[in-house]
């Protein structure tokens, strides 16, 4: 028994010793010193203070960008060009807070071994206080996952990650404004389009487009905005000098698809698009040269006038009406909104769901096509007031063969409507009902 107790004591003592050893050799994480220092930063600059960038590539042309008085970047060398503001900002974001992957040498006497005596890339930045910084990029690391860099005047050699090198290694084509039309879309007040053997002119009043030519017509603003988006998004595709000559030749011999003009208070810009075989080519009044254009741009010019016309009978859209009046033969419906509630002509509070259903049916009224004649004595008229009753719209509707023709008050345009839309409107009007009485 005594011998067994002795054995137990030895086991307990060994366990306590092991626990003490583990405790002394496994300190809490927060007290364990870092195994290595964080790699040092190479550059820490305020991006907003940088007003000039110089990029030199070994064996290539030097590219210089500078901020103008409005704070926008411009290419000033090798020739004056607009700059892609987003691309320049992205590059500066990487450069102004450039981290190293590691510090290779604190002080070296042989930059040549890293390719830094004759760097493949040099990026110089000038701040508004005239202070300059020159980053030199040398050879790739042996594993090709980074590159050697240094700052001019600094004896240290660092490595940076390959993705950082990619974000800094930019050409003229990467940084220039590649838009074929450089006007800002929200400033454009007029669009002229010559395409499909037709000339169409659009004018914008606030956020609404109207057709001005060939005659004043209501425009589908969504369709005009889509045309404008294609024009302002059109970008050049750069290639070699040989490709440029082929592109110019293809444009010259191609068939004209469209000429589009965009106008703002500051002037007008023009884009001509031609098609040669299956490809589109574009020439701009503000950019030298001829460029291949995307199919998205080229195919956007094949719409007819009617494609840009507003087929909706009413303009109130998704604004809530304030007042609705419908006459359908001997039937009449009067609805007025007060606060959040709808009221009938005889002062009864109406069921909101049935009124919203009727409003939806009025919104749904749109033309299947436009007609030149056929309107006769109307059997239905619908009047809608909206925008705090500042907008009043009235439409007259007459039976026409198996469908209906509608005409907005004081406008000559005739809209052919599917008979199912009118039937849905009539049924929804019949289904109007007073609000349920609240239980006391």
Segments predicted by a language model, with ranges:
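A short-motif feature that recognizes glycine-rich, charge-decorated loops
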Residues: 1-440
């Amino acid at each position: 028994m005594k011998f067994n107790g002795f054995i137990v004591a030895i086991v307990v003592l060994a366990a306590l010793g092991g626990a003490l050893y583990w405790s002394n050799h496994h300190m809490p994480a927060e007290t364990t010193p870092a195994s290595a220092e964080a790699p040092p930063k190479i550059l820490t600059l305020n991006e907003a203070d940088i007003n000039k960038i110089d990029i030199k590539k070994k064996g290539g042309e030097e590219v210089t960008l500078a901020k103008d008085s409005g704070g926008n970047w411009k290419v000033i060398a090798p020739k004056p060009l607009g700059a892609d503001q987003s691309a320049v900002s992205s590059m500066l974001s990487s450069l102004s807070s450039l981290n190293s992957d590691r510090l290779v040498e604190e002080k070296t006497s042989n930059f040549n071994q890293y390719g830094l005596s004759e760097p493949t890339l040099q990026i110089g930045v000038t701040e508004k206080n005239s202070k300059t910084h020159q980053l030199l990029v040398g050879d790739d690391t042996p594993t090709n996952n980074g590159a050697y860099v240094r700052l001019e005047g600094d004896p240290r050699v660092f490595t940076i990650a390959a993705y950082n090198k990619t974000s800094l290694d930019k050409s003229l084509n990467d940084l220039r404004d590649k838009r074929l039309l450089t006007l800002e879309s929200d400033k454009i007040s007029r669009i002229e389009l010559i395409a499909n053997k037709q000339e169409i002119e659009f004018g914008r009043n606030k956020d609404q487009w109207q057709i001005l030519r060939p005659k004043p017509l209501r425009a589908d603003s969504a369709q005009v905005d889509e045309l404008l988006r294609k024009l302002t998004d059109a970008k050049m595709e750069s290639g070699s000098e040989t490709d440029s000559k082929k592109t110019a030749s293809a444009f010259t011999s191609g068939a004209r698809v469209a000429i589009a003009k965009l106008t703002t208070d500051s002037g007008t810009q023009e884009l001509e698009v031609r098609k040669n075989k299956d490809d589109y080519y574009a020439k701009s009044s503000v950019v030298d040269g001829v460029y291949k254009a995307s199919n998205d741009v080229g195919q956007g010019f094949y719409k007819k006038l009617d494609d840009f016309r507003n087929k909706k009978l009413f303009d109130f859209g998704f604004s809530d009406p304030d007042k609705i009046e419908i006459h359908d033969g001997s039937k009449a419906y009067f609805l007025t909104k007060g606060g959040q509630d709808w009221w009938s002509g005889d002062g009864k509070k109406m069921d909101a769901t049935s009124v919203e259903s009727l409003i939806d049916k009025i919104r749904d009224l749109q033309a299947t096509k436009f007609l030149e004649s056929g309107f006769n004595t109307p059997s239905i008229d619908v009047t809608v007031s909206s925008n705090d009753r500042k907008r009043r719209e009235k439409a007259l509707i007459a039976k026409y063969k198996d469908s209906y023709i509608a005409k907005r008050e004081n406008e000559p345009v005739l809209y052919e409507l599917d008979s199912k839309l009118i039937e849905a409107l009539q049924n929804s009007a019949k289904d109007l009902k007073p609000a349920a009485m609240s239980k006391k």
